[in-house]
Amino acid sequence: MALSSTNIIKVIVVTDDLEKTVSAYKTLLGTGKEPAEQNTGHKEIRAPFMKYKGADITDTPMKVESVFSDNFWFEIIQPLGNNDPWAAWLKEHGTSICSICLLSDGPLEADEEIMKNAGFDSLFKHEKGYEAYEYFDTSKALGVLVEVKEQYK
């Protein structure tokens, strides 16, 4: 069974030098236009939490900047800690594409079950209260992690 959506909304790049990587992307793509829904007000619907490799965590320190294209954006992350999927990816692969993000059409839990049944474990989950996203360990099969995001309506 396939995921609820194949709508790729962003590509996540990890780097050890945010300014240098962002500059390179902007040189190639320009600054682009931020999607209208990107910075709208958020109403908290669920209680926030974060889990990494099944354990509760409280912080994922990082510097982040987005570079927008016509149909998705690049989220460029420089991890500043060492207890999250971005720091682990950077350590193993260097500056590179870490993951693709698909926008879910339904509850994240349904896509979570599909990924589990396909043999892909949850690596990181962040419930923000107004949206949730989850990273799945698809790196051996796909060469990148897959993030699925649900935005509550």
Can you annotate each of these PLM segments?
Residues 1-4, 153:
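Basic/polar N-terminal segments that are highly enriched at the extreme N-terminus
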Residues 3-5, 14-71, 110-140:
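Core segments of cupin and vicinal oxygen chelate
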Residues 8-16, 65-75, 89-107:
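Vicinal oxygen chelate
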Residues 9, 98, 132-134, 144:
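Generic beta-strand structural signal
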Residues 12, 75-79, 123, 148-151:
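A structural feature that tracks compact, well-ordered secondary-structure segments
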Residues 51-53, 79-87:
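Short acidic (Asp/Glu) patches
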Residues 84-85, 140-146:
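Short, charged/polar, Gly/Pro-enriched secondary-structure boundary elements
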Residues 85-90, 122:
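A short, polar/proline- and glycine-enriched secondary-structure boundary/capping micro-motif
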